[in-house]
Amino acid sequence: MDDVMDDTVELQALPIVQVIDDAVMPPKRAEVTDDLEAVYPIVEMFHSVQGEGFHAGTSSIFIRFGGCNLACPWCDTEFDKWTNMTLREIIGVMEPMPCKRIVLTGGEPALQDLECLGRVLKPLGYSLAIETNGTIVLPEGVLDWVCVSPKDQEYPKVAIRQNTGDELKAVWLLSLIHI
């Protein structure tokens, strides 16, 4: 029985945030004592109507963050260019917008300090939804709606860590289906 192969695999702890080689990560933020001075990499902010999913047709404020821990070849989001804005500046842009529902998107919004966003924005009456690739566990009690859009067909070795949510977004690439 000496020629029997040992199929055992040593399990290793996975990092909290998995990063693909070509990923564009936002810079680390310095610690701040005032939440309103927390800085976020903002690609764009705009008011629009949610166009997909359960909340399609709902008036929403979209905050698109820079940086992503994946590098999906089909992604058309320019998340590698952003403007650093304080939370105070972000609120100033949102205040005149006619709704209180925020959709956090990206890039990968779970790379940001979501707890700080929740501490400041929820008492102001905002609800927070997120569109995430699911590779980062989200803080509990901060988000009102979670849409997980896994990319495991492109990154089969990247673990989906956010295994609960309100909505699953499945994106099928025709090149993978081979019709």
Regions found by a protein language model. Name each.
Residues E131-L138, P150-E154, L174-S175:
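Short, polar loop motifs at secondary-structure junctions
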Residues L128-I130, V146-V148, L168-A170:
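Hydrophobic faces of well-ordered beta-strands that scaffold small-molecule active sites
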Residues M1-E37:
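Radical SAM enzyme core and accessory elements
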Residues P139-V142, V158-G165:
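Short, conserved loop/helix-junction motifs that constitute active-site signature segments
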Residues I177-I179:
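Conserved small/polar residues in nucleotide/adenosyl-binding loops
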Residues N163, A170-S175:
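Glycine-rich S-adenosyl-L-methionine
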Residues P27, D35-L36, Y40-H47, S59-G66, ...:
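Conserved Radical SAM active-site core
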Residues F54:
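S-adenosyl-L-methionine
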